[in-house]
């Protein structure tokens, strides 16, 4: 029985925050009126938007994977590969949604945001693990 349908295993619910972020990214990627276009005062506002969106997506995926008790390897694979693949897919799809266009530098910004998000999560995960190990060794 698939994971999402197993009555005894409801781990997929842990990924609802990631799904909501994914819906937001999809919406922002396909709308005609791009909010970042009006932010002409900020250099590379569009790229910053991509980095922040995918940083949040990677953090959510990693955090959701942790709550779902995924293995560390699977957690990092999902948190890295899913945003990278989805970011590339969205850039390709934008070609078919004028006035949007496919810009591979946007995908690079997605990848940078993903890398920063995963790195931040790794620092948090290492810190939390060391804190847990210290408290268990003191008992």
Go through the PLM ranges and name each one.
Residues 1, 135-139:
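Short, intrinsically disordered terminal tails adjacent to the first/last structured region
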Residues 1-63, 79:
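"…centered on the first transmembrane helix and the immediately adjacent amphipathic helix/loop
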Residues 19, 51, 55, 80-88, ...:
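Residue-level signature of the transmembrane alpha-helical core
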Residues 30-32, 66, 98, 125:
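Short helix-capping/hinge motifs at transmembrane helix termini and TM-loop junctions
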Residues 123-135:
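Membrane-interface capping segments at transmembrane-helix boundaries
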